């Protein structure tokens, strides 16, 4: 496997790409008849991305995590998803004609680290609202929310996914 967790090497600056380390390995593998699986670099974001989008770092019940460790970005963040698609498409353009490439790996260690960013909150409330066809009374009933004054009277009152309500 090659090319995974090398995003900062492949895109050292936003929109500046360098896949020379990938092509160097692929050329050697072609010569030696070694099969290669291409891994996506997306489970470790480059520093420029964290700087440009501070809210791309995962937000969990303790708050926003700092940049540094791998896999602590919010995989639901719009910018993360945009840049993932872009780097993967660029990488595929580079590797597509090498006969030694026999497959692709789309992250083997995807994690979410309990992400509870605002976009996760909104997506969850939209999903639950759809499941209940907007029937907030049925939702309150099914979850017993009248007890301990947990009842919600509008979907905007839905409690944060960062914690739980008493229950």
PLM region spans:
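Aromatic-lined substrate-binding rim segments of carbohydrate-active enzymes
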Residues: 1-65, 92
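Polysaccharide-binding and catalytic clefts of secreted carbohydrate-active enzymes
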Residues: 66-167
């Amino acid at each position: 496997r090659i090319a995974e967790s090398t995003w900062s090497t492949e895109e050292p600056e936003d929109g500046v790409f360098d896949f020379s380390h990938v092509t160097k390995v692929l050329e050697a593998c072609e010569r030696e008849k070694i099969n290669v699986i291409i891994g996506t670099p997306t489970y470790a974001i480059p520093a420029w991305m964290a700087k440009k989008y501070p809210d791309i770092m995962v937000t969990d019940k303790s708050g926003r995590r700092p940049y540094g460790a791998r896999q602590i970005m919010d995989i639901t963040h719009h910018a993360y998803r945009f840049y993932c698609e872009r780097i993967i498409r660029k990488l595929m353009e580079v590797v597509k004609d090498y006969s030694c490439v026999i497959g692709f790996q789309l992250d083997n260690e995807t994690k979410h680290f309990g992400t509870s960013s605002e976009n996760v909150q909104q997506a969850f409330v939209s999903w639950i609202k759809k499941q209940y066809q907007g029937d907030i009374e049925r939702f309150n009933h099914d979850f017993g929310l009248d007890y301990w004054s947990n009842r919600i009277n509008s979907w905007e009152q839905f409690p944060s996914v960062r914690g739980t309500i008493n229950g």
